[in-house]
Amino acid sequence: MEDQLIPIGIHMNPNEFIMSSYGVRMPRIIYGTAWKKDNTAALVEQAISLGFRGIDTACQPKHYNEAGVGDGVVACQVRGIERSELYLQSKFTPLSGQDPERIPYDAKASLAEQVAQSFQTSLRNLKTTYLDCLILHSPLTNQQKMGEVWQAMENIFESGGTKQLGISNCYNLEQFKLLYRNAKIKPAVIQNRFYDKTQYDGTLRDFCQQQGIIYQSFWTLTANPNILAHTTIKTLTAKYQRSTAQVFFRYLSQSNIIPLTGTTSETHMREDLAIIDFELTADECEAVGRLL
């Protein structure tokens, strides 16, 4: 595989990053590692070698091979990539999201201890001493439990274990506002499925913009075939000689949304990274935005 990779020492342009409210430099597109199983290490190595600097994973053996992510990262570090060049984010997944046969922490422990154990497992898997972001994989049903988990994550932040915190799969604006109000360490990131059933999180994204919270999107292409097939997108693909995915990702990037891409195709990896090579006009962004 190495013969097909570009020189590993390549550095991303500063324009390819966005700065979070905690001063963390986040790539404008992130490589997602769910459902890659035994191919995880090779795909992560390939993604980083081609230019990705952001990697998303989770301490959830049900859907992620987190240790494989670590192996892919280490392979790139051996070839010259510094840890400081990478943005690594992982997640604490509550029991409800775990495979009962492969829980990566003591299911009988307190919530705080579950978070701590999961975090330490992530560090071991990823072979790192810190995370750039620790994300709560999904809200807990009970507000008290939610508070316990978030406080445990705050403890990790305050000890220097992670540079910022976030939450995923949180589609209820009032629930998110409550977390934001109660949190000592405010969420810097929210990562949600981006699709029409939630009206593309319009009001939630407005709140995020007001508070300086970075919105990350997943299932961005899979959930939106109608948008990708729309004449508005097709017209822009012809004008810029880009793929439909590139046009949509570029629109999101110019809207300060960081999309995740989980492609296993080298061609698509290169195309996804190339979204920084062109720019839509304000009118074009408005036209794409009307499709949401």
Place the predicted regions along the sequence by residue.
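N-terminal binding-site loop/beta-alpha segment at the start of enzyme catalytic domains
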Residues: 2-86, 90, 223
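Acidic (Asp/Glu)-rich catalytic clusters
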Residues: 20-21, 46-49, 70-83, 87, ...
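Active-site mouth loops of central-metabolism enzymes
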Residues: 27-39, 100-113, 142-143
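Short, acidic/polar
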Residues: 36-48, 108-126, 173-177, 199-201
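A structural motif
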Residues: 52, 128-131, 162, 187
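Structural motif corresponding to the early beta-alpha repeats
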Residues: 83-112, 137
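Active-site groove signature of glycoside hydrolases
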Residues: 123-143
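Beta/alpha (TIM)-barrel catalytic core signal, keyed to glycine-rich beta->alpha loops juxtaposed to Asp/Glu
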Residues: 138-292
